A protein has these predicted regions:
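Conserved ATP-binding subdomain of kinase catalytic cores across diverse folds
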Residues: 31-34, 40-57, 62-216, 257-259, ...
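Phosphate-binding glycine-rich loops and adjacent basic patches that engage nucleotide phosphates
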Residues: 1-7, 17-22, 98-106, 120, ...
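ATP-dependent phospho-/nucleotidyl transfer catalytic cores
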Residues: 133, 162-246, 257-357
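Residue-level detector of functional hotspots within protein domains
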Residues: 6, 15, 20, 31-33, ...
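Catalytic-loop Lys-Pro-X-Asn motif of eukaryotic-like protein kinases
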Residues: 251-252, 256
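Short, contiguous strand/loop micro-motifs
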Residues: 25-26, 125-127, 222-223
Length: 487
């Protein structure tokens, strides 16, 4: 394991030059202090977890100190926001400190969010508040633990720096890790500003560093786009299967690597609601839970438009046509596993859709239903779950179909089925009310609840003694909370 001063930097994006980003120094926070750190994320950098408790750790990730090899840069990009094109966005409060490569040969961006004003801050102050920083930290690590592709979060550093939003709050910084922070909006920026040389340089950078296997294909850029389509289809399939609502699927929030990125007013479903809107600024429901699948395709088409200098329109359309079949295949595979099934049958999609409609009409807790379905035999489980449904006759009909399907599928013992289902059906998810409880405590200086919640969510499939309160249905006040983009 390494100390903080032993990290090895290789700042590949910074070497692209000033057309792609601007050198900016972070603005330090007052009286920085560690709120929470992820041992699993620190392991990606080969860091000894003990370094999180040292004073220099808080100083490095609050803007007070920098590694000599760091090259902090604010990236420039544009994007479609709620369907309308915004010509220039960029890192308005985040800085790419540099890229660190670990002993496994992996490169990880170190991105400090809340680091102060940049040339792209527009009307913002460049700061992030403790509330939003804790939410991003918890979500990043929770999604990773669920097996959903995501950026990672190393730590949150709190402070006494005042920041004004709807009210006065305290400033914080979160250190985000990802193999790359390049977004769909990077390509859109150079396409719409008609800078073909820089756009070609960016495309080569992404191809060589992040999709090198596509170099071997007859049309490398087309192969890369197909891979981006597949990764996004798989990511969104996992969002839908686990009930994750992103909230702000603008193209500047879409990673070129197909990982969940830029956490804002996100939420996991409590009661199943296909039309749930987690962002109270989304008045039209553009980014509602059920719209995430078509919006994923819309965003990929926006990226495709920006790639027309490298790929023919017909080839791009053909690649985009792969999205929905790929999504459906990934989604149905995961939903079969959540139902404890190991084989595929033609009627499985209809059976899943029928169940979700029943859950919608009865307000059934999405996460706990699947967990309890695997607690015992199919017959006993559905008998116990029956009372959760208003339409009992409808549920009984579904239950008969399900039991027959399980009987045809059965090639293992009940214990093996239970273990298989519990391995894909979490007991603990990041419910908004749990995050809010942790934030409320942290805002009064008590970080123990944030740390405990993080630890619980790092093992979502494993029953943890004494942590029953994290596996309950939310109280009425905690259901379907709408979160603002104010962060």
């Amino acid at each position: 394991m390494k100390a903080l001063d032993e990290l090895t930097f290789d700042n590949r994006f910074a070497r692209l030059g000033d057309a792609f980003s601007t050198h900016v120094l972070p603005e330090p926070l007052d009286e920085p202090r560690l709120v929470v750190a992820s041992n699993a994320a620190m392991a990606l950098l080969d860091l000894d977890p003990a370094v999180a408790e040292t004073p220099v750790f808080a100083e490095l990730f609050s803007g007070h100190k920098l590694w000599a090899e760091a090259e902090p840069r604010a990236m420039i990009y544009s994007g479609h926001q709620f369907g309308g094109y915004t010509p220039q966005l960029g890192d308005g409060r985040g800085l790419l400190l540099g890229e660190v490569y670990n002993e496994a040969g992996e490169h990880w961006d170190l991105h400090l969010k809340g680091a102060g004003m940049t040339p792209y801050s527009r009307m913002g102050d460049g700061r992030a508040v403790l509330r939003s920083s804790i939410r991003e930290f918890l979500a990043s690590e929770a999604l990773h633990a669920l097996g959903i592709p995501s950026s990672r979060a190393l730590c949150v550093i709190g402070s006494s720096t005042p920041v004004w939003r709807e009210k006065q709050e305290r400033g914080a910084m979160v250190l985000r890790l990802a193999p790359s922070h390049i977004r769909f909006g990077h390509f859109e920026y150079f396409y719409y500003t008609r800078k073909p040389e820089q756009q070609a340089e960016l495309a080569e950078h992404v191809l060589n560093l992040h999709y090198p296997e596509c170099r071997e294909q007859p049309e490398p850029y087309l192969a890369m786009f197909r891979e981006i389509v597949e990764r996004n289809a798989e990511m969104i399939a996992k969002w839908q299967a686990y009930g994750f609502c992103h909230g702000v699927m603008n193209t500047d929030n879409m990673s070129i690597l197909g990982i969940t990125f830029d956490f804002g007013p996100f939420a996991f479903l409590d009661d199943f609601d296909a039309h749930f809107i987690c962002n109270h600024s989304d008045h039209e429901g553009r980014y509602s839970f059920s719209n995430q699948v078509p919006i994923g395709q819309w965003n990929l088409s926006a990226l495709a438009q920006a790639l027309t200098p490298f790929i023919s329109v017909d080839a791009l359309k053909e690649a985009l046509g792969l999205y929905l079949p790929l999504y459906q295949a990934h989604y149905l595979d995961l939903m079969r596993r959540r139902l404890g099934l190991t084989t595929a049958e033609d009627d499985d999609q209809q059976m899943v859709e029928r169940l979700l409609k029943l859950m919608q009409n009865s307000g059934v807790d999405y996460t706990l239903f699947f967990r309890r379905l695997g607690d015992e035999s199919a017959a006993l489980a559905v008998a116990r779950l029956r009372d959760d449904f208003v339409d009992m006759a409808g549920f009984d009909a579904w239950a008969e179909q399900y039991k027959e399907r399980v009987a045809r599928d059965a090639d293992s013992s009940e214990e093996q089925r239970r273990e298989r289902m519990h391995a894909v059906n979490p007991l603990y998810i990041l419910r908004n009310y749990l995050a809010q409880n942790a934030i409320t405590a942290a805002e009064s200086g008590d970080y123990s609840e944030v740390r405990r919640l993080h630890e619980v969510l790092s093992r979502p499939f494993e029953e943890q003694a004494g942590m029953e309160q994290y596996a309950q249905r939310p109280p009425d006040w905690g259901k379907h909370l709408e979160i603002s983009c104010s962060s």
